A protein has these predicted regions:
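Short Pro-Cys-Gly-centered "Cys-loop" motif that presents a nucleophilic cysteine in a tight turn
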Residues: 1-53, 57, 66-230
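Glycine/serine-rich anion-binding loops at beta->alpha junctions
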Residues: 60
Length: 230
C-alpha cells in the first residue's frame, strides 16, 4: 500500500517526528544534541520555518513548526537530516543511514489544539520515564516556553503569546498547563494523526484542509478538546 501523501499548507502548524533507523540511538553525547540544534536554527531560518516547540529524544526528534512555504518543512528536515548524518558518520567513523526514512507529520489546528501539541512534545521525556518533570530534561523547548530561557531557535506562536493576556507573561500561564497530565486519549490521537500523515483538529478544520488540498483527510481527534486541558 502506498504511503499517504503528507498534508502541508503554508502557515498551518505541523507536528513532525523523525525516528532513528530501526529506532536506534541518534544522539550519543551532549555535543551531538548541540550540533543538531545549531543545524535546526540555521535551516529553520534558511528555509523559512518557525519553530514553536521541540524535543530531542535519544532515538527520535519531535518538532512543532509553522512553514512559510509549501516546501519549507521538507527542506528543513532534509537540510538538518543530511548534515547531521554526515556529522555523525564522520565523528564516529561509521557509514550508512541514521534515520528511518521520511519524516512523519500532521497538520495541527491552531485554535484549541496547538497547545495540546506543545505539551505532548515537551512531556515526551516524562512519558518515557527519563525524568519526573519536563524542566529536568535539557533537550527540549520546555525551559524556553515555560521558564523564559533565551533561544534563537524558538519563535512563539500567537496562541502561546495569547496566554499572557494584556501585558502578562505567557510562560507563567504556560507552566500552569503542565499541572494536569495530557489525557491519554489526546496522546493517542496525536500519535495516530502524526503516524498517518493526517490532521489533528476539529471537523471544521478538517473540512477546510480538504478544500485547500482537494482530497479527503482523516482527523486525529473526534471532537474539540476540553477547555481544562489547554
Amino acid at each position: 500500500m502506498p504511503r499517504r501523501p503528507r498534508v502541508l499548507i503554508p502557515g498551518v502548524p505541523l507536528h513532525l517526528i523523525q525516528r532513528g533507523n530501526n529506532r536506534s540511538v541518534c544522539f550519543f553525547t551532549d555535543e551531538d544534541y548541540l550540533f543538531y540544534l545549531e543545524l535546526l536554527d540555521e535551516q529553520a531560518s534558511k528555509n523559512e520555518c518557525d519553530i514553536h516547540a521541540w524535543c530531542l529524544m535519544t532515538n527520535h526528534v519531535h518538532l512543532l513548526v509553522s512553514p512559510h512555504n509549501a516546501n519549507s518543512a521538507s527542506l528543513l528536515m532534509k537540510g538538518v537530516g543530511q548534515r547531521y548524518v554526515q556529522y555523525i558518520n564522520r565523528t564516529y567513523s561509521r557509514s550508512g543511514s541514521l534515520w528511518e526514512g521520511r519524516f512523519r507529520s500532521c497538520l495541527v489546528e491552531s485554535e484549541r489544539y496547538l497547545l495540546c501539541c506543545y505539551r505532548y512534545i515537551e512531556m515526551n521525556p516524562v512519558r518515557a520515564k527519563m525524568v519526573n518533570h519536563p524542566a529536568e530534561y535539557r533537550w527540549s523547548s520546555y525551559r524556553v516556553n515555560a521558564q523564559s530561557e533565551r533561544s534563537h531557535t524558538v519563535t512563539p506562536h500567537a496562541q502561546y503569546l495569547a496566554l499572557g493576556g494584556q501585558g502578562g507573561q505567557p510562560a507563567d500561564a504556560y507552566r500552569e498547563l503542565f499541572k494536569n497530565d495530557l489525557e491519554s486519549e489526546l496522546v493517542d490521537q496525536i500519535r495516530d494523526a502524526t503516524n498517518g500523515n493526517n490532521v489533528f483538529g476539529g471537523s471544521e478544520f478538517a473540512v477546510d484542509v480538504e478544500e485547500k488540498i482537494g482530497r479527503r483527510v482523516q482527523r486525529g481527534s473526534p471532537g474539540r478538546p476540553k477547555k481544562s486541558i489547554i
